[in-house]
Amino acid sequence: MRQSNMFRHAYVAWPLFNYTDYEGELCDSGVTDTHTTPKISELKTLLTPRFIHFDEWQVFQAYVNLQKTSSNPFYSFAFDALEQYKTQNSNSKIQVLINQVDRGDGRPSFHKIDINDNRSSRNNKRELKIAIANLKIPVEDIERAFRKDREPNVSYERQQTLWKILNEAELQGVELLVLPEVSVPVSWLPFMISHARRHQIALIFGLEHWVCGNKAYNLLVEAFPFRTTGQYKSCLVNMRVKNHYAPEEKRTLEKFRLLPAEPQTDNYFYNLVNWNGIQLSSYNCFELANIEHRSLFKSELDLLIACVWNRDTSYYAHILQSATRDLFCYVVQSNTSQYGGSCVLKPSRTIESEIIKVKGGDNGCILTTKLDISGLRDSQHKSTRGPEDSAFKATPPGYDHERVLKR
């Protein structure tokens, strides 16, 4: 039965492992610790009893890239998965463009990703309903994820909390849900991506440290749903390694003889995504402290997203207030609830700039709001501000107003 692939593929813990030469337990989510690099069987994909989703191919390729010891950077999995999927599925209608931009001036490279959903016109996306998760991430759970003498916390109680947040987001009609850094166990990654595709909700969250050998990978995950030919559900998955590990994070990893997997200076990398006509980029906690990195997409953004686990909320509050005005875009941050600072900001008068700000609580929940994208872009395109433009402040000096037309 295993050789024929004629069984319920939903039981397979990691996507497409049943299409490879892997001989271990397919239902074991601990496959991430095997240090194996399985290869997809062309015969099995040719004779597959079901449709293989694009996001399954991406998650599988991300796993393979983490296990490889080649010089190719981890983020190359996104382009590799796209090209391989198109090769294996000649009839694929995946309308995703990924272009790598290397500025060559010492600044980070980035992927410019364009997701073309035939259901919507780029010019008619007037607002976006988002939610931030107010969720407690104990430090004990973070350490359990990478300590060899502990097991990750994948308890029923933790699962119920996350499920409740996802279900509430669906009930509220949320289009984009943001969760904190290191908020999701590695073994739950396939479920999260599948949920994004099936329910057509974008998810941005931090994955717990993924340990390969003696390296601990702090990964920021983005899942952007779309429909091929306007009707078939699909999903684009982005994952990248944190560019700047926090000093305390490094010290904690070193206590357990682990190395941070942060890239070298010439391999710093980000993503600039155009999804449903909205242009955004995501940052992973301490990356925001780098003034050059957070200004990388000046005049390019409708929305900047930050997934953090951070005690110094005052420091980050100043960074975010600066970012929303300097970049002249909405800023969304999700932090662990015991420290607070989770917020949604817009570039307006101080008294109006905080759309959402929350801290505390024992129960996990979400807070929602709608972002006025058309109003923001209208202000971004104006060189001066008139008395009728009270919803937003004037754009900062040096802002490229013409760039708005190219999104």
Predicted feature descriptions by range:
Residues 1-25, 29, 187-204, 288-394:
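CN hydrolase (nitrilase-like) catalytic-core segments centered on the catalytic cysteine
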Residues 1-121, 128:
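Extended repeat-based interaction scaffolds and adjacent low-complexity, acidic/S/T/P-biased segments
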Residues 84-123, 215-299, 319:
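Active-site catalytic loop in hydrolytic enzyme cores
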Residues 127-151, 239-241, 278-287, 305-307:
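Active-site-proximal beta-strand elements of phosphoester/diester hydrolases
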Residues 156-238, 310-312, 319-321, 325, ...:
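Cys-nucleophile CN-hydrolase/nitrilase-fold catalytic domain and related Cys-dependent amidase chemistry
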Residues 176-181, 280-283, 304-306, 332:
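Short catalytic-loop micro-motif centered on adjacent basic/acidic residues
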Residues 390-407:
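C-terminal functional modules of predominantly eukaryotic multidomain proteins
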